[in-house]
């Protein structure tokens, strides 16, 4: 009888730790609020730093679990969880398609470093998901494809410097279809031309472009 095996109450902490291990993309780290009241917040140590993790709520899980090809727009004001959903979706898709590459674009170096830290904890076996600002991505392209990077221009006119690298990348890189999925956080911080340039690095078919 199945009831024999289910007679004892589940240990909520153990269940939460198990889910964090097998579905890390369903959790948010170091969040101030308790998102999902069905699960307790758990605390753990990684590399001598203490972290807390809470499972996403049902609405956020719904967006995280959906895998739709094409362009997807996620709207919402500041503090509504768009960045949390974005990272969750990016990790989910990277785990579902380990043979393909994915990339997240953010508008600031601070957020970039923060998400990289979270990614290192939540996606321990990561070798196919990158997080960049537009400038760090362009610097990577410059190094890989021997683009001419005039660092004097970088100090004098940052915007002109980036535009110059974008122009070179368009002319030099013949096959730009590098990523199955691209995720752009705080898209209002990017120019239309920059988003168009970023989009050129998607696969031609069966691609995913999420804009937040």
Indicate residue ranges for each PLM-predicted region.
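The feature marks helicase ATPase cores and/or their adjacent C-terminal helical subdomains
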Residues: 1-212
């Amino acid at each position: 009888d199945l009831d024999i095996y289910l007679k004892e109450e589940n240990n909520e902490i153990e269940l939460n730790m198990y889910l964090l291990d097998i579905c890390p993309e369903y959790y948010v780290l170091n969040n101030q609020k308790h998102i999902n009241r069905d699960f307790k917040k758990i605390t753990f140590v990684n590399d001598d730093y203490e972290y807390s993790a809470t499972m996403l709520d049902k609405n956020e899980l719904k967006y995280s679990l959906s895998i739709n090809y094409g362009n997807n727009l996620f709207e919402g004001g500041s503090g509504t969880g768009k960045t949390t959903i974005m990272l969750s979706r990016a990790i989910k898709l990277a785990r579902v398609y380990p043979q393909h590459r994915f990339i997240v674009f953010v508008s600031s170096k601070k957020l970039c470093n923060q998400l990289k830290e979270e990614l290192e904890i939540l996606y321990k076996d990561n070798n196919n998901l990158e997080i960049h600002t537009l400038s760090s991505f362009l610097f990577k392209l410059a190094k890989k494809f021997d683009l001419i990077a005039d660092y004097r221009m970088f100090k004098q006119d940052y915007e002109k410097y980036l535009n110059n690298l974008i122009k070179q990348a368009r002319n030099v890189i013949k096959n730009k279809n590098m990523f199955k999925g691209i995720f752009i956080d705080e898209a209002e911080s990017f120019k239309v031309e920059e988003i168009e340039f970023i989009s050129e690095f998607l696969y031609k078919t069966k691609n995913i472009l999420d804009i937040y």
